[in-house]
Amino acid sequence: MPPDETVPPDGTVPPDETALPDGTTDARARRPTGAGLAARLAQRVARRRQAPALHPYGVTCDALLTVRPTGRPWGEPWLDEPGEYAVRLRWSRAVGLPGRLPDALGLAVRVYDADGPGSLLDLLLTSSGSGRRTRHLPLPRLDALAGPYSTLLPYRIGGQEALLAVHPVVTSPLVPNTLARLRAAVEAEPLAFDLCAAPPGRAWRALGTLTTGPLHDRPPDDRVAYDPYLNRLPHLRPTAWLSGLREAAYAASRRGRGAADPTEP
């Protein structure tokens, strides 16, 4: 009888297969997981673009975050104590569609020294609605200041969950969503946003103010990487919902384009 071709002569199983109790292998074990598929796609797109898989091109500027605590403490010192923090802000189009086509917009917010000197906090915000349901949905936008930017998925803040968002304080005319017009708007005057949080099903609660500053002399495909899973605070972090898929996609996108370590300022 010919030898069983599914098992090598020494009785071991090839490393890409999983042995079942009867000695056979399970083909399902070789199928990529959701996180694996997301990672492969993100790495492939980032390698082709030599830019992030999503939000590939953006406008970067300095900003100032002023935290003004109100109401009950959150259980996170960064939000419970007044303070001012230097910020690097990157405004971008999500898919990178050309021209003035509607596209979801993103704000990548890097807060310096949020948990003491040398610490980093990254928040990734996407244009969304403000209602109890629409605040969780990415919304394409023609006017960059027409509505809020939220984390879409909740954060664990102290002992509770809440969504984080910035709401534009609109004092200027329509800002079209092209990179050129975004750059011009930031260059023309400081743009202000109210930083807010909302527990599930509840109203927004003010946390402070984010104000844009001078533009950075960085190319639109700036390779600085933002990662809210690596750069977080002890008592402020993304919840576990979709965390495996998102972490895998962020890491693969960095590998695909050869980005710098997101833990470096």
Predicted ranges, named:
Residues 2-6, 20-265:
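Active-site-adjacent core segments of small-molecule enzymes
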Residues 8-10, 14-19:
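Long tandem-repeat architecture
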